[in-house]
Amino acid sequence: MKAGVLALQGDVEEHIQAFKKAAQELGISIEVIQVKKPQDLKEIATLAIPGGESTTIGALAKRTGLLDALRDAIKEGLPTLGTCAGAIFLAKEVRDSVVGETKQPILGLMDIAVVRNAFGRQRESFEVDLQVGELGTVRAVFIRAPAFIKAWGDARLAAPLKHPELGQIYAAAFQGHMVATAFHPELSTTVVHKYMLNLAKK
């Protein structure tokens, strides 16, 4: 099987290693490629969109012609994981905890509303064990994380958390072949990447 990691910026190498380790645990042989141009998407069975800076991802995706290619591939059913900034990139509704509505280029594919920087800046990093729907308990690493506040259509929110200002928020979302996490699973667990590989096998 071939998996891809969108390699415009963010923690690309960590996702590559997480896919490799997940495949090893599942007994699947895997090749993981860095997705940098539209034709790379034709080769892969599943995709991870890493964290980093969501406005940068959007701008670079637009410039490289990947924005439309990604949107088309994911719409056609490519199992896709978006983590942290990658989750913001997948969402239909994005606002910033400080500046309100953002006009950044996004894929706009998941029926979820996301608040950027909901947990403040870098110093607001923390780890916690979370119940993430059918994935069970996951060790979640949050770094300048967003928060999911609403879902509609057939999107489902998971991993509930209490936020000091926003109240009840969620750190994961599922919709068909798409998964979004506010945390960085690639830093602490293979559970989420195994889930993506199993989706790709179906």
Curated annotation (Swiss-Prot):
- E.C. designation(s): 4.3.3.6, 3.5.1.2
Task: List the Gene Ontology MF annotations in alphabetical order.
Answer: glutaminase activity; pyridoxal 5'-phosphate synthase (glutamine hydrolysing) activity
Enumerate the residues binding L-glutamine: G52, E53, S54, R116, I143, R144
> What InterPro entries does UniProt report for this protein, alphabetically?
Class_I_gatase-like, PdxT/SNO
The UniProt entry's GO biological process terms, in alphabetical order, are: glutamine catabolic process; pyridoxal phosphate biosynthetic process; pyridoxine metabolic process
In terms of superkingdom, the source organism counts as Archaea
Question: What's an example GO cellular component term for this entry?
Answer: glutaminase complex
Q: Which Pfam families does UniProt cross-reference here?
A: SNO (PF01174)
Catalyses which reaction(s): aldehydo-D-ribose 5-phosphate + D-glyceraldehyde 3-phosphate + L-glutamine = pyridoxal 5'-phosphate + L-glutamate + phosphate + 3 H2O + H(+); L-glutamine + H2O = L-glutamate + NH4(+)
| SUPFAM superfamilies according to UniProt | Class I glutamine amidotransferase-like (SSF52317)
The Swiss-Prot or TrEMBL record describes its family as follows:
Belongs to the glutaminase PdxT/SNO family.
- Stated role: Catalyzes the hydrolysis of glutamine to glutamate and ammonia as part of the biosynthesis of pyridoxal 5'-phosphate. The resulting ammonia molecule is channeled to the active site of PdxS.
Protein's UniProt name: Pyridoxal 5'-phosphate synthase subunit PdxT
